[in-house]
Swiss-Prot record:
Record's function text: Required for the first step of histidine biosynthesis. May allow the feedback regulation of ATP phosphoribosyltransferase activity by histidine.
Protein name per its UniProtKB record: ATP phosphoribosyltransferase regulatory subunit
Summary of subunit composition and partner proteins: Heteromultimer composed of HisG and HisZ subunits.
Record bears the keyword Amino-acid biosynthesis: yes
Pathway field: Amino-acid biosynthesis; L-histidine biosynthesis; L-histidine from 5-phospho-alpha-D-ribose 1-diphosphate: step 1/9
PANTHER family: HISTIDINE--TRNA LIGASE, MITOCHONDRIAL-RELATED, HISTIDYL-TRNA SYNTHETASE
Similarity-based family: Belongs to the class-II aminoacyl-tRNA synthetase family. HisZ subfamily.
Pfam family for this entry, one: tRNA-synt_His
Signal sequence residues: none
Domain of life: Bacteria
Length: 388
């Protein structure tokens, strides 16, 4: 292989150089400290597992199986999967490894691998960070998760200009159940909603039971008042539909109270991972960015695969995506070589204060540390730090 090809990386995989790595690592630490302050306990999950464990979501989310790298275990001969999402692993921990009663709060951070990018120009090796709450089915748990997600993003971004989208799969799901639609028609409608294809939606819904309601759901997806005005009374009286609608209204009201300067929108037909989520869904977007900065929702019963179904809600984000375009100059102090005790004491004190200090080796001079920003100099019998 030519030398020119030995340094090439696969598509969607990149090195993270010091100026950005410092930003990412600082955010990771701040985020985990923030989550700890909210009561979320850190867990580490293995990079590989038997595919049966990682594929628990594949029955409801075929996309996850498609993005999971698979290899043969040289010890057992069984099929292993490289984690593409940590949620199944946390579900296994909650259901089997740490099967406590009551509410459990978890957080995690680590690299996941995808066989193909999940969004345009996204990494195939994102640094996933997330938080999950198990054991509480109330709307308050969902609202807490949205609040925690926004607080975490605030660590990296000024919330000005950001946009929170709220949705609820229960609206579409209860309408599908009431109309008695087949799985194929349900999937076709979901696809039309995702593409915002209103002309096609209008044509398709003409022949469906509650067709005008399905059309109204897409036509007025971002305006709850207009949506209610155009829905039939039968649908508005449906207990499941009404509960979902009320939950969405309550969430909107409470998040507006907690985050008064945040732009919040509604999209009742945002059905990403529709077969996986079971209730409220939420995502935060930045200007000129197609993919969300963070997203999550409710996914009750996720632990059933491991023998313990529990209510669950949570969110995740890619720390690399959160830090796109952010770079930090790393202040580096250069100290002269030598064994002078006063010098060594000054170096130790500076490092203890959180500064980065490099002591020169042998006869090296400043040119050996081209990224140095400061130097340690002796002045009036005191070692001082001066900008270069």
């Amino acid at each position: 292989m030519p030398i020119s090809e030995t340094w090439l990386l696969p598509d969607g995989v990149a090195d993270v150089l010091p100026e950005q790595a410092q930003v990412v690592e600082t955010l990771r630490r701040q985020a985990l400290d923030f989550l700890a302050s909210r009561g979320y306990q850190l867990v580490y999950t293995p990079f590989i597992e038997y595919i049966e464990s990682l594929s628990l979501l594949s029955e409801s989310n075929h996309d996850l199986d498609l993005v999971t790298f698979k290899v043969i275990d040289q010890l057992s001969g069984r099929l292993l999967g490289v984690r593409a999402d940590m949620t199944p692993q946390v579900a296994r921990i909650d259901a089997h490894v740490r099967s406590i009663e009551g509410v459990a709060r978890y957080c995690y951070a680590g690299t996941v691998l995808h066989t193909k990018p999940q969004n345009f120009n996204s990494s195939r090796a994102p640094l996933q960070l997330g938080a999950e709450l198990y054991g509480h089915q109330s709307l308050e748990a969902d609202i807490e998760m949205v609040d925690v997600m926004l607080g975490l993003i605030q660590q990296a971004h000024n919330l000005e200009g950001l946009h929170l989208d709220l949705g609820h799969v229960g609206l579409f799901r209860s309408l599908v159940k009431r109309a008695g639609l087949s799985k194929q028609v349900e999937q076709d409608l979901s696809d039309l909603y995702q593409r915002k294809a209103l002309p096609e939606l209008e044509e398709v819904t003409k022949t469906l039971a509650f067709g005008s309601d399905f059309y109204a759901l897409g036509r007025y997806a971002s305006d709850l008042n207009a949506l209610e005005q155009h829905l039939s009374q039968d649908v508005l009286n449906d207990a499941s539909f009404k509960t979902s609608l009320d939950d969405l209204k309550t969430t909107l009201s409470q998040i507006q109270t907690r985050w008064p300067n945040l732009r919040i929108g509604i999209d009742v037909v945002e059905l990403r991972s529709y077969h996986y989520h079971t209730g409220l869904m939420y995502a935060v977007y930045a200007p000129n960015r197609a993919a969300p900065l963070a997203q999550g929702g409710r996914y009750d019963g996720i632990g059933e695969h491991f023998g313990r179904a529990r209510p669950a809600t949570g969110f995740s984000c890619d720390l690399y995506a959160l830090c796109v375009g952010q770079f930090k100059e790393i202040e580096t102090i250069v100290a002269p070589a030598g064994q002078d005790q006063q010098l060594l004491g000054a170096i130790a004190q500076a490092r203890q204060n959180g500064l980065r200090v490099i002591q020169l080796l042998g006869n090296d001079d400043l040119s050996s540390v081209p990224y140095a920003t400061h130097k340690m100099e002796l002045a009036q019998d005191q070692w001082q730090i001066n900008k270069i």
